[in-house]
């Protein structure tokens, strides 16, 4: 097995663990979300996790041949992921402590365009490269992203109450 693949897979999972730990500490009220050092560490962890996929999947030890249409589908997923993730980030104009409920633009259709983008990014790289071994870290990452979404929805419902419940009923994911 390619040692680069193992190293990058471990870095991916480390980034995932750091972000998940942050979310748990945030839920418990045990982390200062305005602390720039904390933000930098979590942001770097997310970058490592997300940037590991274009390195990891081409080196996957259990790759299978992917038909052209599947490869292109994976690439379209990656491009859509970038549009959703960066579009959501630009629209939010921040990542933490946003004092109002954003319900326009991408957020008028998707409650979590950035999380949707992360999921498409991961799945797109796996599909594009037929990366069978990478399905394990992909499942862990996507499962955690869905968990982060749940934590975020609980926090938004606590903060915005009925306004958020109405918004949630009218949008997907």
Predicted regions and their residues:
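Membrane-anchoring alpha-helices and their flanking helix-loop junctions
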Residues: 1-100, 120-173
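Histidine-centered phosphotransfer motif of kinases
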Residues: 103-116
């Amino acid at each position: 097995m390619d040692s680069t693949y193992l190293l990058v897979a471990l870095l991916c999972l480390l980034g995932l663990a750091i972000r998940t730990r942050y979310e748990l500490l945030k839920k418990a009220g045990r982390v200062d979300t305005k602390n720039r050092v904390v933000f930098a560490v979590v942001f770097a962890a997310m970058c490592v996790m997300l940037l590991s996929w274009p390195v990891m999947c081409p080196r996957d030890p259990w790759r299978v041949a992917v038909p052209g249409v599947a490869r292109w589908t994976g690439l379209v997923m990656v491009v859509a992921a970038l549009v959703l993730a960066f579009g959501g980030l630009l629209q939010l104009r921040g990542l933490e402590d946003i004092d109002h409920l954003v319900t326009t633009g991408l957020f008028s259709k998707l409650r979590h365009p950035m999380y949707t983008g992360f999921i498409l990014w991961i799945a797109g790289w796996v599909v594009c490269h037929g990366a069978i071994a990478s399905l394990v870290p992909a499942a862990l990452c996507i499962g955690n992203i869905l968990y982060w979404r749940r934590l975020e929805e609980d926090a938004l419902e606590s903060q915005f109450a009925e306004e958020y419940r109405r918004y949630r009923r009218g949008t997907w994911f």
